[in-house]
């Protein structure tokens, strides 16, 4: 079953040339990108002693906002996206900046089943796919044993609707109107339920919040709007656990 949402693809295809315009439709991603990269690298280093030969997969890579900085840090990155125009934009940027990244136009379903990676990354993608459950199960299938995945998305709360849609799209104009569909936002507990009876452990939940007084973004324990989730594929466990995460236990 495909996770492609054709309406979402059409929406992003119209602006796919503008990924690297810091003042354009993806400007908000540029403003939070240093936090995203720092978080990813922190999780990688906490899981691996030797990071020199790690294989990283970036799913739904867009124009390469995650793949490019990681490649610049010396990581071996494969990045996939369903949109040809996104891959073209990402490839052009990589070539101009001398970055070696294996870009592929592909969905997670089209990736060969035996292709496994030490780190699988999927940021701000889940809320745009057609079948969230199948997408997540396909995603974690490509993690090597004892490897990790880092995903981020938006929580389905009243607070997320207020700040993620009303404020971000209609008041501040951080992202184009109709970028998000509230019904596609995902509660952490729903991801936990999807991963039940798998060998995937949820290691951490971390929120990303905007401090209006300081005009800056920061990591937080507040997961009501944006959140990161770090997963680990265990060798022997057959049941997903929440690793004692209080925010997750509270909403299950």
UniProtKB/Swiss-Prot annotation:
Residues reported to bind S-adenosyl-L-methionine: 36, 60, 81, 123
Biological process annotations from GO: methylation
Matches recorded under InterPro entries: SAM-dependent_MTases_sf, UbiG_MeTrfase
S-adenosyl-L-methionine in keyword set: yes
Pfam families assigned: Methyltransf_23
Keywords, in A-Z order: Methyltransferase, S-adenosyl-L-methionine, Transferase, Ubiquinone biosynthesis
Family to which the UniProt record says this protein belongs: Belongs to the methyltransferase superfamily. UbiG/COQ3 family.
Role summary: O-methyltransferase that catalyzes the 2 O-methylation steps in the ubiquinone biosynthetic pathway.
Protein's UniProt name: Ubiquinone biosynthesis O-methyltransferase
Species this chain originates from: Rickettsia prowazekii (strain Madrid E)
